[in-house]
Amino acid sequence: MADASDPEDNMQYFLIFTLLWAASSNARDWRTPDEAQVTLEYIAHAAFRLVGSQGTSLLVDPYQSRWWIGYDFPSGLPASDAVLLSHPHPDHDAGYARGATPPWSADTRIIDGPGDYTVGAFSIRGIRGRHAEPYGEEFGRINTIWRIEVAGLRVVHIGDNEPLNAAVAAEIGDVDVIMLPVDDEEHILSFEEVERYRRRLKPLVVVPMHYRHDDLESDPDRPGDLGSVDGWFARQPDGRQLGTHTISLSRSALKELPGVWVLEHSPLVTRAE
């Protein structure tokens, strides 16, 4: 993967990132004091954990082990208070809709559709979207975009949503951090469609997801229609490889380090053999 990071040692990115938003006539009313923090953890594929400062946690779009992608979902993750599932493909719901044993406990709250939800300090809006073509016809191409507000930040995970339209953009609103599916095979979104999300929503940070991890795949031809993120990332003048799978976010300095952040996958995810 191309290294577009600053020359300083990658360990600097373990520092807490914070977000400062200039006062304006449309200042965001969900802002909270600078001391509030949230931890973002990339697991692999399109799966993330968000952990609030009080310990409440969300698991977003966990994948089913060795379904399409060739590696396992890690068994050593801490329990989450709720799991958000954007759509019923097994690489986004861990096979839950098909009766697979999920990687979360029986008492975990499952949120899998549009609506407004509260989980601890997290305010969540599920926005009705549509799965990118030509996939998902078997379940009506449903896809829920997750807009998550916590610690003065708005974090958006689009699942496998189609190209952005005006109605969805208006409901998403302002964005601080967005997770977008991007890979060199343009499996879900074309590069231009990814840029349309960036231009319209103007997130401070883009975190790419839903791409091939070569170090985890034992079969060079599997999955055949999912590329790495390397080529796209090499084109990003504001790209940074953070050298970590977990970062802490707060609101007072995030815009000092805007752009594309490529996170490592969790070390708990091991190569398929």
Located regions from the model:
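Bacterial N-terminal signal peptides
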Residues: 13-21
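Active-site environment of divalent metal-dependent phosphoester hydrolases
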Residues: 65-69, 88-94, 163-166, 185-190, ...
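Short, Lys/Arg-enriched N-terminal segments with co-localized hydrophobic residues
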Residues: 2-10
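Metallo-beta-lactamase
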Residues: 80-90
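Charged helix-capping and loop-helix junction motifs
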Residues: 140-141, 190-196, 225
